A protein has these predicted regions:
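A charged, aromatic-enriched C-terminal amphipathic alpha-helix characteristic of glycosyltransferases
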Residues: 348-405
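Carbohydrate-associated surface elements
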Residues: 48, 163, 185
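Nucleotide-activated donor-binding/catalytic signature segment of Leloir-type glycosyltransferases, i.e.
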Residues: 249-267
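Aromatic "clamp/platform" in nucleotide-sugar-dependent glycosyltransferases that forms part
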Residues: 287
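Conserved donor-binding/catalytic core segment of Leloir-type glycosyltransferases
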Residues: 158, 197-225, 237
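Short hydrophobic beta-strand element within catalytic cores of glycosyltransferases
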Residues: 304-307
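Short alpha-helical donor nucleotide-sugar binding micro-motif in glycosyltransferases
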Residues: 266-267, 274-279
Length: 446
């Protein structure tokens, strides 16, 4: 570890974490592990999942707080304004947290933690994993109500691609100097190629993702029949579930493709490699992406990727050898797929083992963690504004939602004052010192 950085006590906060599976969940898990390896103290704060409540230690030693918050929609908690203050304050004090790192625009818990932590004069960092538009109602509400106000008082912001950075700066009207770009990574040891299947299996195209409009499920419905009509032996494997699955089932029925299009449904993450190893080509039809983890996983397994040219995807993999990019137009994607199939059958695709080795060098979690700790250092070194200064920033963003955020901030300030009166931070610090001393003595006796 760079001795000039930290060590810091860090709380990674998001509604999305294990046992749930997804890009944000994976990112937090591996980032936490690598930060611990670098010498930092890390805890994760999320909401309870079924019977998983309270404090849990994962197999890698990571401490996780599963707090009893109400889940409102799609895994995100219902913002309660004052209800989360006692819980988050207690965890921040108990763990001597210096830096709060929130993840995901969609996580109400992350935004609450950033606001409460900021008013406690703790340092704050936010990672935006999403890419939004500017015109539709949901994007306007997210940009105005969440990003413009929630991030105005955050010390440092991380985006997963340069396209995502530009998008976030514009959406949130942020100072570009406090927004950095650090790409995602994958645990390449979990995504290794199977050369025997790659060469012996019939030509197989794999799609893994949620079957929703945003992921281009409508494009899939048009692409598959056209490719199957022009190439009589190609197979498709589709892993994932969602509202568009019915349309894909109808397409398969209409064109009598039951034996050539396999629908796997929802796929546990530990089975992703097994499915990828059955194919040689991976198709991604997303209409918008900040950084597409699935195409990196596919490339790590040795597959050639055919993808839409949207968002931050052109930054992810080298074009031609690793990925073929086309606009999200059915005929263009069909043409790209047919060219990839021709390359596969003539033995002109890159060797899967060499591709895996190259991806391993491009994307690894230790590198992401080292770059992230530099952002933490910037956050710690940046001046922490007073509570009055924070309220002024909300007001300057616009009087409408500004008054709403000022009101919420004042309620939180009063709530913190009452809690500090009955449970002083100094008393908590003494308890933490005694607890640390007890652990040290126990370790010495052993």
């Amino acid at each position: 570890m760079n001795t000039s950085i930290g060590p810091y006590s860090i709380a990674l906060v998001s509604d999305f974490f294990c046992p749930n599976a997804g890009g944000v969940e994976t990112h937090i898990y591996f980032l936490a592990q690598c930060l611990i390896d670098l010498g930092h103290r890390v805890v994760v704060i999320t909401h309870s999942y079924g019977d998983r409540k309270g404090i849990r230690f994962l197999s890698n030693g990571l401490k996780v707080y599963y707090l009893p918050f109400i889940v409102a929609y799609n895994g995100a908690t219902l913002s309660s304004i004052i209800g989360s203050v006692p819980w988050l304050r207690k965890v921040f004090l108990r763990e001597n947290v210096q830096i709060i790192h929130g993840h995901s625009t969609f996580s109400a818990l992350a935004h609450e933690a950033l606001m409460i932590g900021g008013l406690m004069r703790l340092h704050t960092v936010f990672t935006d994993h999403s890419l939004f538009g500017f015109a539709d109602a949901s994007a306007i509400l997210t940009n105005t109500l969440v990003l413009q106000y929630s991030l105005i008082n955050v010390d440092q912001i991380i985006c997963v691609s340069y396209t995502s950075k530009e998008n976030t700066v514009l959406r949130g009207k942020l100072d570009p100097s406090k927004v950095s770009t650090i790409p995602n990574a994958i645990e390449t040891r979990l995504f290794t190629p199977d050369s025997q299947q790659f060469h012996k299996n019939p030509t197989t195209v794999v799609f893994l993702g949620r079957l929703v409009y945003r992921k281009g499920a409508d494009l899939l419905c048009e692409i598959i029949p056209k490719v199957c009509a022009q190439h009589k032996t190609v197979r498709f494997i589709i892993g994932g579930d969602g509202p568009k699955r019915i349309e894909l089932e109808e397409m398969r029925e209409k064109h009598k493709l039951h034996e050539r299009v396999v629908m796997l449904g929802m796929l546990p993450h530990n089975q992703v490699k097994q499915v990828l190893n059955q194919g040689q080509i991976f198709i991604n039809t997303s209409l918008t992406e900040a950084f597409c983890m699935s195409i990196v996983e596919a490339a790590s397994c040795g597959l050639h990727v055919v993808s839409t040219r949207v968002g931050g995807i052109p930054e992810v993999l080298p074009v031609d050898e690793f990925i073929s990019l086309e606009d999200p137009v059915p005929d263009d994607l069909v043409e790209a797929l047919l060219k990839a199939i021709e390359k596969r059958e003539k033995g002109r695709l890159m060797n899967p083992e060499k591709k895996h080795e190259a991806v391993s060098k491009m994307y690894n979690w230790p590198d992401v963690a080292e770059r992230t700790q530099i952002i933490y250092q910037k956050a710690v070194e940046s001046p922490s504004p007073t509570r009055i200064a924070r309220l002024k920033k909300y007001y300057n963003q616009g009087i409408g939602f500004g008054i709403l955020y000022i009101t919420v901030a004042i309620i939180i300030i009063f709530g913190l004052a009452i809690l500090d009166f009955f449970d002083s931070p100094a008393k908590n610090r003494k308890k933490n010192q005694k607890r640390s001393q007890r652990h040290t003595n126990t370790g010495t006796n052993k």
